[in-house]
Amino acid sequence: SAQRRCAYAFALDQGYEGIVTIDGNDKDDPEAIPRFIEALKQGVDFVQASRFIAGGIAENTPKSRDFAIRFVHAPMLSLFSGFRWTDTTQGFRAYSRKMLLDTRIAPFRDVFVTYELLAYLSYRAPKLGYLCLELPTTRRYPKGEVPTKISSFKGNLSVLLVLFRACFGFYSTN
């Protein structure tokens, strides 16, 4: 999204060597942030939170979302990127400065309006040989009504279209 791109640009302009992002919806436990920073310090270029690997916790995840992530989104990005992802839809991530400034990735383009950048980076970074890692995290949905910006058939179809475009190189620079 434009907000993500602005945040990345600001952090890079300030000289930061890496960026950690976390969704502002209070579903992710920020206790994992120091592990994300440590992974960047150890040379990892892309750290992705995962509630589905050993040590991760998925609490009250809506069944339809759980199914879509485990059996559509993550497997498809894994197949096309060459890296085994398990949890590709959330924004709890960390990126190295080197990766974000790579002109072959070029994340500062106007084509990234909604969720495109999240899917694209999961596809493109491993394809270019960047060191990627998933770390276990906790993601808790509240009981009852699920707060989300993705709703209805139209919203889910949009996410699926973004996924296909990312996997088939639509957002790639070359």
Say what each PLM segment does.
Residues 17, 45, 131:
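Residue-level detector of anion-binding/catalytic polar loops
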Residues 25, 53, 138-140:
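Conserved beta-strand edge residues that scaffold enzyme active sites
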Residues 112-120:
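Acidic donor-binding loop at a coil-to-helix junction in glycosyltransferase catalytic cores
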Residues 159-174:
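C-terminal, non-catalytic tails of nucleotide-sugar-dependent glycosyltransferases
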Residues 1-13, 30-111, 142-160:
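Acceptor/aglycone-binding surface of glycosyltransferases and processive sugar-polymer synthases
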Residues 22, 47-50, 135-137:
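Short glycine/serine/threonine-enriched helix-capping/active-site loop
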Residues 16-27:
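Short beta-strand-to-loop acidic/aromatic patch adjacent to the donor-nucleotide binding site
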Residues 109-110, 122-139:
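Catalytic donor-sugar/metal-binding loop of nucleotide-sugar-dependent glycosyltransferases
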